[in-house]
């Protein structure tokens, strides 16, 4: 996967992400996950694609799934194994998922992974590979950033140093700083709006079952900035096309 620029493949970023929890803006990305999985998923075999340091993998296990986490970053996988020695964390080279069981998973979760993957063709290739890993009744939950996250301020993020984000077009790079940890080096993501994702899903042989854009309710113990008015995340619930 020669055009995959992974800005998270370094020890400093892995160490920073290992300290993240489900607080502040990140709370909204996972708050509704138990309900979504209860509604749509039958079975317990799960894959966490782009697991990073294992935060989302451990959540799935807490929710009762038998889960394997995979990532292309050796630093992230090393950190996940250090935090959770009993967990199943696997390093995959680029987008080679041939070692994973075909039609072996009732659930595949991908949290924020596709924010950093450029180009429709690369996204489609990955989604097709993930589709082949799903059981016929399996579900793929893809959580990604909304375009609005890159032009507003948040409890967990800042974009005020990057006014060029305002003029970004679909497929352009955008920058964002995570304020929940000390490493303030910006992440370089790819702007990919809703219509572009719908096209990618269709070409990948995936059907959209549900779309959620979670907002903060205002009664949570977090210092919301934009979260009660603007959704930072969009959660796509997908299944193989019939």
Residue ranges and their predicted role:
Residues 124-136:
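A short glycine-rich, Lys/Arg-flanked "PGG" loop and its adjoining helix->strand segment in the class I
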Residues 47-49, 53-97:
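Class I SAM-dependent methyltransferase SAM/SAH-binding core
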Residues 204-242:
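C-terminal lobe and adjacent flexible extensions of AdoMet/dcAdoMet transferase-like proteins
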Residues 1-41, 55, 59:
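Conserved class I S-adenosyl-L-methionine
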Residues 115-119:
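A short His-aromatic
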Residues 110-113:
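A short beta-strand submotif of the Rossmann-like class I SAM-dependent methyltransferase core
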Residues 99-108:
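A short acidic, Gly/Pro-enriched loop at the edge of an enzyme's catalytic core
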Residues 141-202:
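SAM-dependent methyltransferase
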């Amino acid at each position: 996967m020669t055009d995959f620029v992974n800005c998270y493949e370094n020890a400093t970023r892995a160490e920073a992400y290992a300290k993240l929890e489900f607080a502040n803006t990140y709370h909204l990305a996972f708050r509704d996950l138990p309900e979504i999985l209860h509604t749509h998923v039958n079975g317990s075999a799960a894959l966490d694609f782009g697991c990073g340091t294992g935060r989302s993998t451990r959540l799935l296990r807490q929710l009762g799934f038998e889960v394997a986490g995979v990532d292309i970053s050796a630093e992230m996988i090393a950190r996940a194994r250090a935090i959770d020695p009993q967990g199943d964390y696997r390093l995959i080279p680029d987008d080679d998922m041939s070692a994973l069981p075909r039609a072996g998973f009732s659930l595949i979760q991908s949290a924020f992974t596709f924010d950093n993957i450029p180009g429709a063709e690369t996204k489609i290739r990955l989604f097709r590979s993930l589709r082949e890993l799903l059981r016929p009744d399996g579900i793929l939950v893809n959580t990604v950033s909304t375009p609005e996250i890159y032009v507003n301020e948040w409890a967990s993020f800042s974009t005020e140093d990057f006014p060029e984000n305002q003029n970004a077009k679909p497929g352009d790079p955008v920058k964002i700083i995570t304020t929940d940890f000390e490493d303030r080096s910006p992440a370089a993501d790819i702007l990919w709006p809703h219509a572009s994702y719908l096209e990618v899903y269709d070409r990948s042989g995936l059907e959209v079952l549900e779309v959620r854009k979670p907002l903060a309710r205002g009664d949570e113990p977090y210092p919301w900035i934009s979260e009660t008015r603007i959704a930072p995340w969009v959660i796509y619930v997908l299944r193989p096309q019939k």
